[in-house]
From Swiss-Prot:
Glycans are attached at N53, N71, N112, N128, N161, N175, N208. This is Interleukin-4 receptor subunit alpha. It comes from Equus caballus (Horse). GO terms for biological process: cytokine-mediated signaling pathway; production of molecular mediator involved in inflammatory response. Receptor for both interleukin 4 and interleukin 13. Couples to the JAK1/2/3-STAT6 pathway. The IL4 response is involved in promoting Th2 differentiation. The IL4/IL13 responses are involved in regulating IgE production and, chemokine and mucus production at sites of allergic inflammation. In certain cell types, can signal through activation of insulin receptor substrates, IRS1/IRS2. Disulfide bonds join C34-C44, C74-C86. Residues 369-397, 441-468, 514-536, 606-674 are annotated as: Disordered. It is found in: Cell membrane.
Length: 809
């Protein structure tokens, strides 16, 4: 092959470049849309694959599908580098018109399509938009873009856009669906003093059209006056702020003026030298006003307003002054309240500042101790009156009965022995242990040892057996007795004497409470007996008598004698008072007192052998029969009589060392090595007990020989006839013979007539006792002497606590 000539090389190169350019022609990416205004024109728009000069490279040809129509050409224009728009003119567009479209790039057909204008309608944009202000409203108007004869004139709807000129995002859209191209906008709906712009566009909804382009915009300035309703909240808020500012400014101004001007004015009330006058002594020392009664302090702002505006606050101040006066005066207090009180400030007196006065003065009246006066009254009379007693009886039947009983006992005891005086003080109550039985004697050498208690029937009541050491026994502390009771003080003189069984049986409760002995001494248990600490405070004379007997250490003894022992005791004392004058009267008193003592020893639970009419008699000095079983000596009171053991073989029946049947251990004065020594307290109490024992001793002894009075009688058919003798019957007329022991002198006669035959059935019947329940009385002797009535020792024994029948003397 040959080579090309150098002259042909340039033309070949140009042909290759042209072919390459032809093969790389432009392409249409997509046909955007074709719309018709439905009047005279239609618009088509498409996008090229690369930037293209639409008017130089492209052309659009369109032709109505009709044989007689011409082929028309449209030169496109560039909207953008790659977007081309072509406007096609059409005459008398109708709904049935259809056009054929062809896009050419030179001789190359890019695309072809058909287009029906009635189905692709895009109305024209409204024109001539204007804004008018009418009565606080804005009227927007525009013109319809279609003539009246066009089909779209009545098919258009509008959309109005109102926005702030400076802020396009703040806008409002109004949809106008009616035919009239107008819009009314209320000025209040828009912000005042703001510039707004409006624009409008149209659409033919029935033709399936799209929104037209926005019309040219119009602007206006929104300025209007707000109505009163809208201006009122703002005005109120502004007014409140102004008023608050004025008040604060006035307050601080007044405070500043007060500090700089008002406080500088001299005022005597601010002076520290103020004398306080103290009055109204009826106010209590501790009676301070409560918070509710204290007058409220006036706040500072009120004080300032009062000084500045006195006329406005005058009425309120008067009410406060009246209320403060009422609180200060207070209610009237009765004279029964405390006499000493503190003093309260009622007035202030202004003094010159030169004078120095104390800022406060308190006047108090000291309380007078009334206890010193009571002590002085007690020194004058040992029996305090009921008025001075803090716990006296209440006025009423109980108080009257207590005072009558007091006067009766004082009269009876005074008639018996005028040397008793008025002393009725009780023994000290503060001692830790009080002896249960007090031994009275003239000196420490004559103190008698206490007896031992033995059961009446050891087989039937083994728990009642007592074991006692040879020394003196220690007993429980006596229950506390209120010593401030006037009736009890009156009884204390007589209660200091040994009590007889008749007096003990006058109160059934007394017999029950006599069972409270020392826990160290074994005795029969009494489950129904309440503890001594739980006993109520004595209020009646019977209860006080019971408490006194408990203090004296009386042993328990079951008794169920009827009430009325007080009357029997009073009768006995009256009869005993005549013993000093004549023998028969003394014997009658002795027998009545014996019947009283016999009646007090009745036991309701006794059964078995029936006693005879003489078994319930009073046998104070009768020794036990040799043939009879050893009785259990359960003595109650010995009335201060000195008793010696009988010098007979019967003493061997009652050995003192037998643990099964302990009995009395008779000894002679000065021979008992186990005799306990009396303490100073017991020696002091013995002097007082001598006074009480002298009453009974004078009633039961003969004034001629100093021996006991005896009653001789005989029993006939169960009845005891008593014959009283004017003397003791054993040594009357024989003054030279020394007095023998009462026990020896009162041994039972050989005839077998017991001493208790002198006890009449009448006296037993008066106490409500039957012959079947007449117990025997036994006596427990104690060493001592009976040389004179002024030195009569007092021996108090213990009662058996068993449920069997007991007898006391």
């Amino acid at each position: 092959m040959g080579c090309l000539c150098p002259g042909l090389t340039l033309p070949v190169s140009c042909l290759i470049l042209v072919w390459a350019a032809g093969s790389g022609s432009v392409k249409v990416l997509r046909l955007t849309a074709c719309f018709s205004d439905y009047i005279s024109a239609s618009t088509c728009e498409w996008k090229m694959d690369r930037p293209t000069n639409c008017s130089a490279q492209l052309r659009l040809s369109y032709q109505l599908n009709d044989e007689f129509s011409d082929n028309l050409t449209c030169i496109p224009e560039n909207r953008e580098d790659e977007v081309c728009v072509c406007r096609m003119l059409m005459d008398n567009i109708v709904s049935e018109d259809v056009y054929e479209l062809d896009l050419w790039a030179g001789n190359q057909l890019l695309w072809n399509s058909s287009f029906k204008p009635s189905r692709h309608v895009k109305p024209r944009a409204p024109q001539n938009l204007t804004v008018h202000a009418i009565s606080h409203t804005w009227l927007l108007t525009w013109s319809n873009p279609y003539p009246l004869k066009n089909h779209l004139w009545s098919e258009l709807t509008y959309l109005v856009n109102i926005s702030k000129e400076d802020d396009p995002t703040d806008f409002k859209i109004y949809n106008v669906t009616y035919m009239d191209p107008t819009l009314r906008v209320t000025a209040s709906t828009l912000k005042s003093r703001a510039t707004y712009s409006a624009r409008v566009k149209a659409r033919a909804q029935n033709y399936n059209s799209t929104w037209s382009e926005w019309s040219p915009s119009t602007t206006w300035h929104n300025y209007y006056e707000q109505p009163l309703e809208q201006r009122l909240p703002l005005g109120v808020s502004i007014s409140c702020v102004v008023i608050l500012a004025i008040c604060l400014s006035c307050y601080f101004s007044i405070i500043k003026i007060k500090k700089e001007w008002w406080d500088q004015i001299p005022n005597p009330a601010h002076s520290p030298l103020v004398a306080i006058v103290l009055q109204d002594s009826q106010v209590s020392l501790w009676g301070k006003q409560s918070r509710g009664q204290e007058p409220a302090k006036c706040p500072r702002w009120k004080t300032c307003l009062t000084k500045l505006l006195p006329c406005l606050l005058e009425h309120g101040l008067q009410k406060e002054e009246d209320s403060s006066k009422t609180v200060r005066n207070g209610p009237f207090q009765s004279p029964g309240k405390s006499a000493w009180h503190t003093v309260e400030v009622n007035h202030t007196i202004l003094r010159p500042e030169i004078i120095s006065v104390v800022p406060c003065v308190e006047l108090c009246e000291a309380q007078v101790e009334s206890e010193e006066e009571e002590v002085e009254e007690d020194r004058g009379s040992f029996c305090p009156s009921p008025e001075s007693s803090g716990s006296g009886f209440q006025e009423g039947r109980e108080g009257v009965a207590a005072r009558l009983t007091e006067s009766l006992f004082l009269g009876l005891l005074g008639a018996e022995n005028g040397a008793l005086g008025e002393s009725c003080l009780l023994p000290p109550l503060g001692s830790a242990h009080m002896p249960w039985a007090r031994i009275s004697s003239a000196g420490p050498q004559e103190a008698a040892s206490q007896g031992e208690e033995q059961p009446l029937n050891p087989e039937s009541n083994p728990l009642a057996t007592l074991t006692q050491s040879p020394g003196s026994l220690a007993f429980t502390e006596a229950p506390a007795v209120v010593a401030d009771n006037p009736a009890y003080r009156s009884f204390s003189n007589s209660l200091s004497q040994p009590r007889g069984p008749g007096e003990l049986d006058s109160d059934p409760q007394l017999a029950e409470h006599l069972g409270q002995v020392d826990p160290s001494i074994p005795s029969a248990p009494q489950p129904s007996e309440p503890p001594t600490a739980l006993q109520p405070e004595p209020e009646t004379w019977e209860q006080m008598l019971r408490q006194s007997v408990l203090q004296q250490g009386a042993a328990p003894a079951p008794a169920s004698a009827p009430t009325g022992g007080y009357r029997e005791f009073a009768q006995v004392v009256k009869q005993g008072g005549g013993a000093a004058g004549s023998g028969p009267s003394g014997e009658a008193g002795y027998k009545a007192f014996s019947s009283l003592l016999a009646g007090s020893a009745v036991c309701p639970g006794q059964s078995g052998v029936e006693a005879s009419s003489g078994e319930g008699g009073y046998r104070p000095y009768e020794s036990p029969d040799p043939g009879a079983p050893a009785p259990v000596p359960v003595p109650l009171f010995t009335f201060g009589l000195d008793v010696e053991p009988p010098h007979s073989p019967q003493n061997s029946l009652l050995p003192g060392g037998s643990p099964e049947l302990p009995g009395p251990e008779p000894t002679v004065k000065g021979e008992d090595p186990r005799k306990p020594l009396l303490s100073a307290q017991q020696a002091t109490d013995s002097l007082r007990d001598d006074l009480g024992s002298g009453i009974v001793y004078s009633a039961l002894t003969c004034h001629l020989c100093g021996h006991l009075k005896q009653c001789h009688g005989q029993e006939e058919h169960g009845e005891a006839h008593t014959v009283a003798s004017p003397c003791c019957g054993c040594c009357c007329g024989d003054r030279s013979s020394p007095p023998v022991s009462p026990v020896r002198a009162l041994d039972p006669p050989p005839g077998g007539v017991p001493l208790e035959a002198g006890l009449s059935l009448a006296s037993l019947g008066s106490l409500g006792l039957s012959e079947e329940r007449k117990p025997s009385l036994f006596f427990q002797p104690a060493p001592g002497n009976a040389q004179s009535s002024s030195q009569t020792p007092l021996t108090v024994a213990m009662l058996s606590t068993g449920p069997t029948c007991t007898s006391a003397s």
